[in-house]
């Protein structure tokens, strides 16, 4: 009985430590696109299916990074960083890209530009990308 209890305790500890490491790995992956000089102070988010996000790490500068891997119209590996002020534009991009058809996405972007509903980027902001067939 003591062996079973010890085994279960060990399994719980290992499981808990694995879960605790997952956010760190997500943060590290998202930060791959960030310039080294901005990396330590960057905010890291994780996009949700409803185009809102959870903050994985609060930063001290204006840079925000996130993983786009697995999202429609993205490379097999895709991470991106930009200004916090651009998050509404990113959310709009994600909504348009969710249909998974580049031609339809472009048509939606063009229509939003034409009718004035396209979210403007922060003037002078930069977008950093790291993407490709694998990490």
What does each model-found stretch correspond to?
Residues 17-19:
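Intrinsic disorder/low-complexity segments
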Residues 7-15:
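Bacterial N-terminal signal peptides
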Residues 1-4:
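Positively charged n-region of N-terminal signal peptides that target proteins for export
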Residues 21-135:
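Primary mode marks residue(s) on the alpha4-beta5-alpha5 output face of response regulator receiver
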């Amino acid at each position: 009985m003591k062996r079973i209890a010890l085994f279960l305790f060990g399994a719980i500890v290992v499981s808990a430590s694995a879960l605790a490491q997952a956010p760190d790995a997500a943060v590290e992956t998202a930060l791959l696109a960030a310039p080294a000089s901005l990396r330590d102070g960057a905010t890291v988010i994780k996009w949700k299916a409803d185009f809102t996000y959870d903050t994985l790490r609060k930063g001290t500068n204006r840079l925000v990074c996130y993983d786009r891997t697995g999202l429609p119209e993205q490379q097999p590996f895709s991470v991106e960083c930009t200004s916090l002020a651009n998050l509404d534009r990113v959310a709009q991009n994600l909504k348009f890209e969710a249909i998974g058809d580049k031609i339809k996405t472009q048509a939606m972007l063009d229509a939003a530009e034409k009718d004035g509903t396209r979210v403007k980027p922060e003037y002078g902001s930069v977008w950093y990308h790291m993407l490709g067939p694998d990490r």
